[in-house]
Regions:
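Non-catalytic, mostly N-terminal accessory regions of nucleic-acid modification and defense proteins
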Residues: 1-171
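Conserved class I S-adenosyl-L-methionine
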Residues: 170-179
Length: 179
């Protein structure tokens, strides 16, 4: 299967990711929460795209991307919170990803704007290197903006926990983050 960027170059999509960050910043969402909320929203969107390709869905009916995109106002916020709560109860990988998930975008107009912006792209079929470039850009911008670690990248604790839960290393094994 060929990867796509829907005719858009990397800088255009990186700009879109930062436009989303600006929307969330205007809603009072901090950088760490931005990363978390963007991850949840992109996961829901990519699961939907995967299902459209006939590859199945990891998410139960009633808690999918499609259940969000048609809503607005407090109904949208309520549904997003319901989805996060329900997915956190899953006993598999989904539950690990959404452990203690909570909504940090409490303004309906801001949540609707983020969903609209994410919905305008096909994220699932993007090349893995491209997705990595987006992640690196986010980390780099955080290092510049917060002067956190002078540009060094730190793996968030929630990500470390999720990796350990999924890999399930034995007491004598090591999991490395070579970056």
């Amino acid at each position: 299967m060929a990867s796509i960027t829907q005719g858009k170059n990397e800088s255009t999509l990186l700009k879109k990711v930062w436009d989303i960050a600006n929307v969330l910043a205007a809603a009072g969402v901090g950088f760490t929460d931005y990363i978390t909320q963007l991850t949840y929203i992109l996961f829901l969107k990519m699961d939907s795209e995967k299902e459209e390709l006939g590859l199945g869905s990891a998410i139960h009916e009633g808690y999918k991307w499609e259940d969000l995109v048609e809503l607005n106002g407090t109904d949208l916020v309520d549904k997003y919170e319901e989805i996060l709560k329900e997915l956190s109860k899953d006993t598999g990988l989904i539950g690990t990803i959404f452990t203690k998930a909570s909504n940090k975008i409490d303004r309906p107009v801001m949540l609707a704007k983020v969903i609209e912006m994410v919905n305008g792209e096909n994220w699932y079929m993007m090349d893995g290197d491209f997705k990595g470039a987006i992640y690196e850009s986010i980390l780099e911008k955080n290092g510049q903006d917060k002067k956190s670690g002078a540009g060094q990248y730190f793996t968030p604790r929630a990500l470390i926990k999720a990796i350990v839960d999924v890999v399930d290393p034995k007491i004598t094994e090591t999991v490395a983050d070579p970056a």
